[in-house]
Curated annotation (Swiss-Prot):
Organism listed in the record: Escherichia coli (strain K12)
Function: Chaperone required for the production of an active PaoABC aldehyde oxidoreductase. Stabilizes the PaoC subunit and is required for the insertion of the molybdenum cofactor into this subunit. Binds molybdenum cofactor. Binds the molybdopterin cytosine dinucleotide (MCD) form of the cofactor after its formation by the molybdenum cofactor cytidylyltransferase MocA.
Keyword annotations: Chaperone
Protein name: Molybdenum cofactor insertion chaperone PaoD
Gene that this polypeptide is encoded by: paoD
UniProt-recorded Gene Ontology molecular function terms: molybdopterin cofactor binding; protein homodimerization activity
Highest rank taxon of the organism: Bacteria
Gene disruption phenotype: Mutation results in complete impairment of cell growth in the presence of cinnamaldehyde.
Amino acid sequence: MSYPLFDKDEHWHKPEQAFLTDDHRTILRFAVEALMSGKGAVLVTLVEIRGGAARPLGAQMVVREDGRYCGFVSGGCVEAAAAFEALEMMGSGRDREIRYGEGSPWFDIVLPCGGGITLTLHKLRSAQPLLAVLNRLEQRKPVGLRYDPQAQSLVCLPTQTRTGWNLNGFEVGFRPCVRLMIYGRSLEAQATASLAAATGYDSHIFDLFPASASAQIDTDTAVILLCHDLNRELPVLQAAREAKPFYLGALGSYRTHTLRLQKLHELGWSREETTQIRAPVGIFPKARDAHTLALSVLAEVASVRLHQEEDSCLPPSS
């Protein structure tokens, strides 16, 4: 497929990937930068999956009027074609919907997974909805975007939002970045913090538990205890009990965890509360070195988060 395009300044543009990212904050900022500088941009959203797909429902990309784009709505097989469609529609000013893979008129664009996807292309008219989303995420609050194809409008939903079609609009829910709170003066803690730096998570490592740290624990936080000392764990566990992080894991053997549970029950913890603690921490049994343990812990955190995100998607409309 060729990509000649005639823009308002009578220049030809070809779609070009600006950089690789699937981080929604980076994608939305890319759009905001264009709009704030007076340039046009299109928001592309994955709104339907038929069969398998490489990206989740609600995945997005942004295409600027100069042809540069970022984000993913597939495994990389339709992004250039979608960018071409976005550039073409900027001239008309009319939003559109396109299908790729199964059920698509484009026989030369095949999804390796064998399924099909539907994308909506919305010409952004204001940066305000995107700025509102970014501001909520900066405040570590859940937020959503609602796109109405008939009105060709985009609005911010200042509340927790499930991704999917809702009445005549498609809504995308966003959660704050995962925050890792790692506690312990140990090789395991250092290795976990080092590996976490590559994940894009907001990572913090502590030796002792500062009083100010309890305010940083929220429902998008993973609390990881790598202390080798049950008594030093207790202030962190008590803070986590109130804040309810989505993940709470602790280092130690089954015997150590039995002692931990005894201490917590003495402090008034219920059985339901103590079952929220993942111990021994990690998905690999009996990890014997620090880096394997770090990988095991972060894999478990990612798994729990993934299940949480899957639960936030609406079932397909009938």
